[in-house]
């Protein structure tokens, strides 16, 4: 089904600007910056007893794994909603703690409790805390920038994916709320530019922007045949006996079996080993968190 560009551009014409200026002029208590802290959005209710506690070490490990997978993957991977909520909440709490320490609030509290204030020589732990916090922010920003670059590159593909009723994953699972807003605004601006510059001067039968019948596909899709390095982790929950895909090879080692379509051959991926495979072959295992890109 062709995308009706006139309907899309009509929606864009209703907006006078690409960015809502009212969000920029809010007070300092709700001021946001277009960095990683804004694009992912964060709100975590610590009083929600239904949530399972996850240690900071586990969250950091999961972030590094998601970061590496995103940078090495040719496609846009699903957004880790709960992980990012927890991480941004931890960053907010840690930033507040560092600010209280740097302004001497904790020193005054210690003095009131007949405890000596922290000497200047003891500020080294504070500097280490700030450095570690900035390192975490760097990884999150790099992760979000990588995702935004893929959103820009595969804008039409994501729009087509959203309109496909047979799609295995929805756009709300693939993107965060702010990423969806960014994708919608970016794609509308791009379509308006292409229409005003080129399409409206061409015959009507040549104005389709998602033609896939010619020799060249007009929709940029991820390179499914890209070679990637993978590390086979095994079941993420540690329940080896309950994994139906897990088998034992001739040496008695647990492994996964994948099929290479071009060669029509089966390959055994042993747990704990490293392989080079086409992304399409290990895509399902990556989605199930049974392999990691390196």
UniProtKB/Swiss-Prot annotation:
Entry keyword set: DNA replication, Nucleus
Task performed by this protein: Required for DNA replication. Functions as part of the GINS complex which plays an essential role in the initiation of DNA replication by binding to DNA replication origins and facilitating the assembly of the DNA replication machinery.
InterPro entries reported in the protein's UniProt record: GINS_A (IPR021151), GINS_bundle-like_dom_sf (IPR036224), GINS_Sld5 (IPR008591), SLD5_C (IPR031633), Sld5_GINS_A (IPR038749)
Protein name: DNA replication complex GINS protein SLD5
A GO biological process held by the record: DNA-templated DNA replication
Main localization (coarse): nucleus
One Pfam family it belongs to: Sld5
Family of the protein in this entry: Belongs to the GINS4/SLD5 family.
SUBUNIT field: Component of the GINS complex which is a heterotetramer composed of SLD5, PSF1, PSF2 and PSF3. Interacts with PSF2.
GO cellular component, one term: GINS complex
Keyword Nucleus set for record: yes
Domain of life from the UniProt record: Eukaryota
Subcellular location per the Swiss-Prot or TrEMBL entry: Nucleus
Entry annotated with the keyword Nucleus: yes
């Amino acid at each position: 089904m062709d995308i009706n560009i006139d309907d899309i551009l009509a929606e864009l014409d209703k907006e006078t600007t690409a960015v809502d200026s009212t969000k920029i002029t809010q007070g300092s208590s709700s001021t946001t910056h277009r960095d990683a802290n804004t694009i992912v959005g964060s709100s975590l209710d610590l009083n929600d007893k239904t949530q399972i506690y996850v240690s900071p070490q586990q969250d950091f490990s999961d972030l590094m794994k998601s970061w590496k997978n995103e940078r090495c993957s040719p496609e846009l991977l699903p957004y880790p909603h709960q992980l990012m909520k927890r991480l941004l909440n931890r960053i907010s709490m840690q930033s507040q703690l560092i600010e209280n320490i740097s302004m001497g609030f904790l020193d005054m509290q210690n003095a009131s409790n007949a405890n000596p204030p922290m000497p200047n020589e003891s500020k080294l732990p504070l500097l280490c805390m700030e450095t570690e916090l900035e390192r975490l922010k760097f990884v999150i920003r790099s992760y979000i920038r990588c995702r935004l670059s893929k959103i820009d590159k595969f804008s039409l593909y994501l729009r087509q994916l959203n309109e496909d009723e047979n799609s295995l994953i929805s756009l709300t699972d693939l993107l965060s709320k702010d990423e969806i807003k960014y994708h919608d605004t970016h794609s509308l601006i791009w379509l308006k530019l292409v229409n005003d510059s080129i399409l409206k001067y061409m015959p009507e039968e040549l104005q389709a922007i998602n033609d896939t019948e010619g020799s060249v596909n007009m929709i940029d899709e991820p390179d499914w045949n890209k070679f990637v390095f993978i590390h086979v982790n095994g079941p993420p929950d540690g329940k080896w006996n309950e994994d139906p895909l897990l088998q034992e090879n001739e040496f008695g080692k647990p492994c996964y079996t994948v099929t290479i379509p071009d060669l029509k051959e089966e390959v055994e991926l042993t747990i704990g080993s490293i392989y080079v495979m086409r992304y399409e072959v290990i895509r399902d295992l990556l989605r199930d968190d049974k392999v990691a890109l390196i």
